[in-house]
């Protein structure tokens, strides 16, 4: 019985038929008429306003150790629904479309959390309504083993990120305290103490031990990496000889250029952003780096490319939302704000191919990639179209998407607020805080930095059939049932507050 939705305990029904709803209508028609009627009625009621869904395969659900992972999520998230699939996660498209929960957690064993699954989840979560954007906050929750995955699922205390460690340059002025070891300049690092300005320091020529110590002793809340990587290692230096982080069977170790070994053992809950690394999100077996980060380094949420990265929009752009707008977004929200930015760029600059889903390793698809007039005016090329298509579905998000990890409040270049301005009417106000510098790129390290649209998520889903911009249309806002997106204002950005007002209703 593929694609089952588990209804809340206590729902009545003959022979427990009302406890599940199947997406397989052929199977459904085989049920006695009375249970079918009751089944559909209770399913509709149960799915009216869902907040959280756990998606899991029948095989994983049948494994007691992994079922405890799913059960832990159900226990933590009130009213959570369980959707089960048999042969492919794509089977869950119909029940998710019927429910459209705010959060969807795909519980998967490492053997299931493949590159194919990541791509399938990206695509199916854009198909839940008529707009081209991702419709839910989703994450794939896995671990080196069920015990590791359970620890991730049980993490409930929100994480306020105060301490950051990085193997690449960051905007440290936006964080409370942190250290960056430069992957481009040997011997160069920057450190920020709480309450002080960032200061340049001399770093060791080989930073392997320093980075392991930053994890083991420094216990950062956020760890960031870039540079060359495979599923088995991270090459610390990008432009100069340096050591490695390597993984095997869930264990992580640093290995410097002299062959010295430094085991990683860092168990404080943290989030990890390998924003510029190839393959760090590709789980291809028990020795995968992603699993070692979860098992040996305390990672509760992370993103990661499942293929070699060459464009970078979907990775590096998360810094623009998460680190450079401190406190505004959770890590989940920052990931999906950047995803919305990418989809918007495709829809605006390359509308003829924006919804193509079969994409090659160099961003090729069945149709020729032609920039729109808007793209030509913005200096966007055919290569950008291929890069955006490639990046769209090749970055995984691992962890419970409802778990909140956000930076401690810090400097912001603009303020954005969403307020009720009347019955079923809302106003987004954007107030520049840095004058003419308010919307300039903060940090240029990496690839495809800056120029991101303003994204404001709504506290709850709105009725997509009752959305209308009533003022501020000159800013070309995009209004969906879960967020409003305002394109980056560019050089013509106002230096005083500006407003966008829209009508919207909550689902009845």
Regions found by a protein language model. Name each.
Residues 49-508:
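Cysteine-dependent hydrolase recognition
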Residues 3, 10-13:
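Residue-identity detector for glycine
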Residues 41-45:
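N-terminal signal peptide c-region/cleavage motif recognized by signal peptidases
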Residues 30-39:
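Sec-dependent signal peptide recognition
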């Amino acid at each position: 019985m593929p694609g089952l939705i588990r209804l809340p305990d206590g729902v009545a029904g003959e022979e427990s038929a009302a406890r599940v709803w199947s997406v397989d209508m052929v199977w459904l028609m085989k049920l006695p008429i009375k249970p079918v009627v009751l089944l559909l009625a209770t399913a509709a009621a149960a799915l009216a306003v869902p907040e959280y869904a756990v998606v899991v395969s029948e095989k994983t659900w049948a494994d007691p150790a992994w079922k405890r992972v799913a059960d832990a999520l159900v226990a933590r998230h009130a009213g959570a629904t369980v959707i089960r699939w048999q042969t492919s996660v794509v089977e869950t498209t119909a029940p998710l479309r019927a429910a459209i929960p705010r959060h969807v957690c795909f519980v998967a064993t490492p053997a299931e959390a493949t590159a194919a699954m990541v791509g399938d989840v990206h695509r199916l979560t854009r198909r839940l309504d008529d707009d081209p954007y991702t419709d839910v906050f989703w994450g794939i929750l896995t671990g080196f083993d069920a015990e590791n995955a359970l620890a991730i699922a049980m993490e409930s205390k929100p994480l306020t990120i105060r301490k950051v460690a990085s193997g690449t340059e960051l905007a440290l002025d936006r964080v409370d305290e942190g250290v960056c070891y430069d992957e481009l300049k040997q011997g160069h690092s920057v450190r920020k103490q709480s309450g002080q300005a960032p200061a340049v320091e001399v770093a060791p020529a080989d930073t392997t031990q320093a980075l392991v110590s930053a994890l083991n002793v420094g216990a950062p809340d956020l760890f960031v990496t870039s540079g060359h990587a495979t599923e088995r290692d991270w090459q610390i230096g990008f432009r100069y000889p340096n050591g490695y982080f390597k993984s095997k069977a869930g264990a992580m170790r640093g290995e410097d250029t002299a062959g010295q070994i430094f085991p990683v053992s860092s168990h404080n809950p943290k989030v990890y952003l390998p924003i510029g690394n190839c393959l760090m999100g590709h789980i291809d077996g028990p020795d995968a780096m992603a699993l070692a980060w979860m098992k040996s380094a305390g990672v509760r949420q992370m993103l990661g490319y499942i293929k070699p990265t060459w464009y970078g929009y979907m990775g590096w752009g998360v810094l623009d939302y998460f680190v450079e707008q401190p406190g505004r977004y959770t890590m989940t929200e920052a990931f999906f704000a950047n995803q919305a930015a990418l989809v918007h760029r495709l829809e605006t600059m390359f509308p003829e191919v924006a919804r193509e889903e079969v994409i090659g390793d160099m961003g090729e698809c069945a149709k020729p990639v032609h920039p729109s007039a808007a793209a030509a005016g913005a200096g966007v090329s055919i290569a950008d179209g291929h890069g955006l298509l490639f990046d769209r579905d090749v970055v995984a998000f691992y962890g419970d998407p409802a778990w909140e990890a956000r930076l401690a409040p810090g400097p912001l270049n603009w303020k954005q607020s969403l307020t009720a301005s009347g019955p079923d009417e809302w106003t987004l106000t954007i107030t520049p805080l840095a004058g003419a510098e308010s919307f300039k790129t903060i940090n240029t390290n990496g690839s495809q930095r800056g120029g991101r649209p303003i994204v404001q998520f709504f506290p709850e889903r709105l009725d997509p059939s009752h959305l209308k911009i009533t003022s501020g249309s000159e800013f070309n806002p995009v209004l969906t049932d879960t967020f409003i997106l305002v394109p980056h204002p560019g050089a013509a950005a106002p230096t005083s507050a500006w407003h966008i007002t829209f009508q919207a209703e909550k689902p009845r």
